[in-house]
Amino acid sequence: NPDGRDRYVNWFNQVKATPYSIDQNAKEHVEPWPSGRPNHYLFDLNRDWAWATQVESSQRIAIYNKWLPHIHVDFHEQGINNPYYFAPAAEPFHEVISDWQRNFQTQIGKNHAKYFDKEGWLYFTRESFDLLYPSYGDTYPTYMGAIGMTYEQAGHGRAGLGIQTNEGEVLTLKDRAIHHMTTGLSTVEISSKNAVLLNSEFKKFFDNSNLKYKSYVLKNENQDKLNRLKKLLDKHEIRYQSAKEGRAKGYLYSIQDQGKMDLTSSDIIIHTDQPKGKMVKVLFEPKAKLADSLTYDITAWSLPYAHGFDAIASKTKLPSSNVAKDSTIKNSIARSAYAYISKWNSIEDATFLGALLQENIVPRFSEKAFSIEGKSFERGALIILRNDNRNAEFDAKLIAIANKYQRSLTTVATGFSDSGVDFGSYSVKPINQQKIAVISG
């Protein structure tokens, strides 16, 4: 998993012996924290395909969805004493995986085995690495219709140019490269021989008429939260629409049982009758069906639960319409304002706060709810006082940041509240520049 490849290579070049040492205790085989496993933000990109929290993931799935390959291999490395792993995968398989996808993995594995047996190379299959959790480099492609597979070669961050395994064998970088090359070419070979079937079965995968739920509805109770999820769906090229006013029957996520939900035009609907319908099922279904409780990773990831939405899954396709374009917030400078106020409701508000601090704008926050000039604010509201920010560019900077992050600012001419705390209260505290220390050793 070379997400931090440059970090690993730079470290290795600093400590390697010439010629290389095969002793497991040599410094070149004991990579320090944080290792080359994660990216710059110490995130495991191999678990980020579906969630796309990292910029690398967003860029990767954009390319993936441009091509939508029939075959996708995720080449990895594992511990030095585990020789080589290739398809077929272990149970559990998600139920959307077709019989063809299952069976062709076995054909691919047998083709690899032919070449490994000839050379006397060790390998294993059908262990450890299952096809359930949707955010891997094998499952994500699988749920997009491909034959998605993980190939794991012994080595990882320990092997360097060569290392002696616990069995006394010397594993070299050349060995590792040849093994991956062999399975790679074997994959191309068996795929080429089955090109017609690959095409026809790939097409069949996108028939979503047999899916249990036809529509998933997300209740819009927080526009920031909804916008965040819409951006994620856009990355995966999953279509969504606005609900039409009415009442829907189906599986209510909040009670985990059958129920009803009143719909408004601000709610969104994701239908399974679309090219990415099976991925919609995988990401939105209330409970993934488990064929085997022993699995390599988590078993619950349903987006409505993960993002905190009231939601309903309907067995009938609900009426919907095209989503209206989001309105743009445009704040204006108010030089006579005593203070600007911004509500605190979402992660986006925290992003806005961070941007203010980076521009040396001093905000305060209220620990208690208050009302002022006829408007009510819950605790956590940001209060940006003119008296705390006495520089000529204060208003212009604040408005520019608020407009950039689409935060609506309320201006007030006084710090005297209608009810609740006044702005000089000890419950209204300044937020100073934060300095974070990371201790390592």
Regions found by a protein language model. Give the residues of each.
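Detector for the c-type heme attachment site
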Residues: E77
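Intrinsic-disorder/low-complexity accessory segments
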Residues: Y41, R47-D48, T53-V55, Q59, ...
